[in-house]
């Protein structure tokens, strides 16, 4: 949905419309946008959304999720140890347990839930979005005319996340 390098954000509604018209499955990586920008699987014609919990959703590291539109078939990456049908030779076929091999990160999931609830209270996510975009804009505005910097992406563009990538012209980026 957005680049963690350039900060550019894609127009999901437009992309989703094209995908639906062409019968193309739309899988969205919302790692940079979940918790900052609203995403509607229905309105944006998204088939699958994956996200990380430790960024703007304020969950612990090691958390994340996969939202799958009903009717989309996903094969499990791992199987075994479901905890529900431990002694069966076949992994459960029902969702979501079909994709849950091994012991769930219950503490992490509880932490992610707490982060999401916090953001949803009083629509705090809107304030975070405005504040982070404002800080990124201020940072870019103060440095954009400095000849020492090379900026990547389109920091002044419309569809953005609060990420500014730059290099010092005279320095190796590996240093």
PLM-predicted stretches and their roles:
Residues 1-175:
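Pyridoxal 5′-phosphate
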